Amino acid sequence: CPHFIELGDSRRFLNIEVSRPMVRIKNLVHTSWQTASTSLESRVVISAREVFDVFCEYGETTCHPAENGSYVICIRDTCNVHIDNYYGLHGWGFQGHHGIKGLYGNRNTFNRVDFHSFGYDVFFKDLTVKGRQINLQGGNEWSIEK
């Protein structure tokens, strides 16, 4: 299991930041027991921004539930993202923010799926949403199947 150190005292703590295209993250297990008094709402486990071809496979993230947000995976302005076999009960689960084109997910469990601004061509198969909701904004093709 990899270990990551959080640096800084800002509102946003990232464990993994994807800043180049064609990245594969496999077999990640992340356990975090922060509480609301330690900025739980500002945490993101995996973040990708302005890249393409991102593959997240076989991962699990767990922590104390949070009402006010914390995302397992946060994707911004990115194309061709694949998320397969993820179990994430870390605040709100998955967030697509400011634009995703081509999101593909298979066999995932999230506490919440949340799109801010827009998502285009989004396909989830065998998706389980536990606890919260799905917030969709965007267009073109959407397909969400159990």
Over which residues does each language-model region extend?
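Extracellular/periplasmic carbohydrate-active domains that bind, remodel
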Residues: C1-K146
